[in-house]
């Protein structure tokens, strides 16, 4: 991870080239790529996928999603890996990559191997063009959750989306589970105008606490 503006197009191209080279050893041909709503994510996504296509990879664009939705796609689609463009709970000017081969996230040692490839520019030579296709995974993920989780009584729940991608579908999740939901900061916004999306900082929970108390909710 690093500052999003630090990832110039050539830097992202080098990361894509290193991933394509390293994953070629594992016969990776098809991958899912997702991104969060940070201001730099779309630009990084375009640079990354353009280069991966140059290396012959078939890309399934799962859109603006949470990291768990990207991981869900690895287990439910016929793909060989995936990349999530995100900086998780870091400030809005940060961004980064979470890469997987098969169903496993790259280890720290594997990431160091990518770093060596980038330093040496020791990339495979592309032989054919790949492709890109948009895929909508969120409804499949919600249906899977609904099959796995059952709630015996109606729960009144408050959710603070912190202007992150979860706001795109969280209401659907709880509605299908039969919950009564009250949602804060639902609209994805890479500026995170209401608060930093880090729930480990107690001050970021103040609006949610107020909501739970005001509405007398069961949980938040």
What residues fall within each predicted segment?
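Short, highly selective alpha-helical patches that border small-molecule cofactor pockets
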Residues: 12, 16, 41, 45, ...
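Residue-level detector of alpha-helical secondary structure
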Residues: 14-21, 47, 51
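Short, small-residue-biased leader/transition segments that mark boundaries at the very start
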Residues: 2-7
């Amino acid at each position: 991870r690093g500052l999003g503006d630090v990832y110039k197009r050539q830097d992202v191209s080098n990361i894509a080239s290193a991933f394509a080279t390293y994953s070629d050893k594992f016969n990776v041909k098809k991958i899912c790529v997702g991104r969060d709503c940070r201001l730099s994510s779309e630009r990084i996504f375009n640079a990354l996928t353009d280069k991966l296509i140059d290396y012959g990879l078939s890309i399934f664009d799962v859109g603006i999603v949470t990291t768990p939705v990207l991981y869900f796609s690895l287990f439910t689609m016929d793909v060989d890996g995936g990349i999530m463009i995100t900086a998780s709970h870091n400030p809005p000017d940060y961004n980064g990559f979470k890469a997987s081969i098969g169903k496993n996230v790259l280890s720290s040692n594997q990431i160091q191997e990518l770093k060596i490839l980038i330093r040496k520019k020791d990339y495979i030579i592309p032989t054919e063009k790949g492709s890109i296709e948009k895929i909508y995974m969120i409804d499949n993920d919600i249906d899977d959750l609904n099959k796995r989780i059952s709630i015996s009584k109606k729960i009144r729940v408050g959710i603070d989306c912190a202007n992150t991608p979860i706001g795109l579908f969280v209401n659907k999740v709880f509605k299908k589970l039969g919950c009564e939901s009250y949602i804060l900061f639902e609209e994805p916004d890479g500026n995170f105008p209401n608060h930093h999306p880090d729930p480990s900082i107690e001050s970021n929970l103040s609006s949610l606490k107020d909501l739970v108390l005001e509405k007398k909710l069961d949980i938040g």
